[in-house]
Amino acid sequence: MIKQRTLKRIVQATGVGLHTGKKVTLTLRPAPANTGVIYRRTDLNPPVDFPADAKSVRDTMLCTCLVNEHDVRISTVEHLNAALAGLGIDNIIVEVDAPEIPIMDGSAAPFVYLLVDAGIDELNVAKKFVRIKETVRVEDGDKWAEFKPYNGFSLDFTIDFNHPAIDASNQRYCMNFSADAFMRQISRARTFGFMRDIEYLQSRGLCLGGSFDCAIVVDDYRVLNEDGLRFEDEFVRHKMLDAIGDLFMCGHNIIGAFTAYKSGHALNNKLLQAVLAKQEAWEYVTYEDEAELPLAFKAPSLVLA
């Protein structure tokens, strides 16, 4: 049986909030089977829980938030959510003593290290996957995203940025997903932004944690970070990282082929909601026999050692 995963032990890290610029303590806790992914704000009394749920997602200019029925929110969840998807973590409590998850270096890599450090524990309950049965597509102007049936998890993402720093040949990225491929090829890709946007936001008391330490920063001509890019195509790889996190907001790894053109958080979420709303387009599946599991979701070699 393919089993649900959680952490072996509690781990903690500190970082800076992208919005406030203040120190945030992040605590990742193991959780029992069928808990799902729960984000928790401990700065509120009593603490407020935000279960990962496609319908709770709000996309803002700076980040993805989860918002509850009382309009309380937790921000900047997308990169940690991508790390959870990458390692196939089904059950976890994510605690922060702030309104947001720390931005760390703007990628998912620090969260991957934290999860690997905690260790992955298998629970004696079958892991549920969402399997795509029919093609579902959403559009917004010339942007679109779609899922098709496929026995695995493949991603094909194209961006269209007319910018001297982004070579035309580096605007498409395709990948057959696996935990190892995610860690090596996607997790280190950082978020990016324009210097002028960051300066404007900071002049209004926003994005106070934004810096060269947590993003690729560009002006109209070039990348301003002294160390340059981690990959030639880091921009499109980061958009794929975002998509992996966005699509895991249903709390389950998805079996299907994802293709997107110029998509972002809002359209990725619209696709996920469109799939879930169409009952005949998907089904929950479990695997009694590991041999039947799509290669994409085999346990990562270094994690379950």
Swiss-Prot record:
Binding site for Zn(2+): 79, 238, 242
Class of the enzyme per the UniProt entry, highest EC level: hydrolase
GO molecular function: metal ion binding; UDP-3-O-acyl-N-acetylglucosamine deacetylase activity
Keywords: Hydrolase, Lipid A biosynthesis, Lipid biosynthesis, Lipid metabolism, Metal-binding, Zinc
GO CC field: membrane
Enzyme nomenclature, EC number: 3.5.1.108
Pathway recorded for this protein: Glycolipid biosynthesis; lipid IV(A) biosynthesis; lipid IV(A) from (3R)-3-hydroxytetradecanoyl-[acyl-carrier-protein] and UDP-N-acetyl-alpha-D-glucosamine: step 2/6
Required cofactor(s): Zn(2+)
Gene Ontology process terms (BP): lipid A biosynthetic process
Function noted in UniProt: Catalyzes the hydrolysis of UDP-3-O-myristoyl-N-acetylglucosamine to form UDP-3-O-myristoylglucosamine and acetate, the committed step in lipid A biosynthesis.
PANTHER family the record matches: UDP-3-O-ACYL-N-ACETYLGLUCOSAMINE DEACETYLASE 1, MITOCHONDRIAL-RELATED
UniProt name for this protein: UDP-3-O-acyl-N-acetylglucosamine deacetylase
Organism: Cronobacter sakazakii (strain ATCC BAA-894)
Lineage: Bacteria, Pseudomonadati, Pseudomonadota, Gammaproteobacteria, Enterobacterales
